[in-house]
């Protein structure tokens, strides 16, 4: 295991909240879950795990930004997709954390992600220049990832030249390591910690899961 994420041992992180939220019908960053905005909930969960948190927001993203967490916009105009947020995260991390080799990204729409996310992704680095990606139940969660800053220029070129700009396809271009996370035990059965909340219906389901979670479950 190689830990070269930062001088302090903790990596910088960026919450990806710059999407259109078209399926939700309103900005996901400002949507309430359990009386908290999704953005507040994600930041609260992420804060103990990382050295710093910025939020990738664009003009349409909405939501009040918690104090102490800078907003960063895509560096490539035209909303070219989530990889633009990853690139913005890499560029920001290079500026604010000169000793860091990686940046962690977390999407706004999965509020139950593990409290061990950052530590386990960091611990999975072998050579030190891989992308560490979260998995659960046999599925990749490509935006829950630890990205090496050294591949920022390649990502910039990929976004500008590849028509589809698929996150999984970009990951396949580089060395990566998969980190599998178990389901969470709840009173209502197992919960995928990367449960996605993209629609009003999924938000209702997330509220139900929140009510069922055992105090020690996550």
Swiss-Prot record:
Name the UniProt record assigns to this protein: Molybdenum cofactor guanylyltransferase
Subcellular location: Cytoplasm
Classification via InterPro entries: MobA-like_NTP_Trfase (IPR025877), Molybde_CF_guanTrfase (IPR013482), Nucleotide-diphossugar_trans (IPR029044)
Keyword GTP-binding in record: yes
Subunit structure: Monomer.
The species this protein was found in: Sinorhizobium fredii (strain NBRC 101917 / NGR234)
PANTHER family per UniProt: MOLYBDENUM COFACTOR GUANYLYLTRANSFERASE
Binding residues for GTP: 16-18, 28, 56, 74, 109
A GO term, aspect molecular function: metal ion binding
GO terms (BP aspect): bis(molybdopterin guanine dinucleotide)molybdenum biosynthetic process
């Amino acid at each position: 295991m190689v830990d070269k994420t930062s001088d302090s041992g903790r990596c910088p992180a960026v919450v990806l909240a710059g999407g259109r939220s078209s399926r939700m019908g309103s900005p996901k960053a400002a949507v309430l879950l359990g009386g908290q905005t999704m953005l507040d909930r994600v930041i609260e969960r992420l804060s103990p795990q990382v050295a710093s948190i910025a939020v990738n927001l664009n003009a349409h993203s909405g939501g009040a930004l918690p104090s102490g967490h800078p907003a960063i916009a895509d560096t490539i105009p035209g909303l070219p997709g989530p990889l633009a947020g990853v690139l913005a995260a890499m560029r920001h991390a290079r500026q604010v954390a000169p000793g860091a080799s990686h940046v962690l990204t977390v999407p706004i729409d999965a509020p139950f992600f593990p409290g061990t996310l950052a530590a386990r992704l960091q611990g999975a680095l072998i050579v030190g220049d891989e992308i560490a990606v979260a998995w659960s139940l046999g599925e990749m969660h490509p935006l829950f990832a630890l990205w090496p800053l050294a591949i920022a220029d390649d990502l910039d070129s990929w976004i500008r030249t590849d028509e589809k700009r698929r996150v999984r396809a970009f990951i396949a271009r580089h060395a990566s390591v998969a980190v599998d996370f178990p389901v969470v035990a709840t009173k209502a059965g197992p919960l995928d910690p990367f449960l996605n909340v993209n629609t009003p219906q999924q938000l209702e389901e997330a509220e139900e899961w929140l009510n069922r979670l055992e105090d020690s479950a996550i």
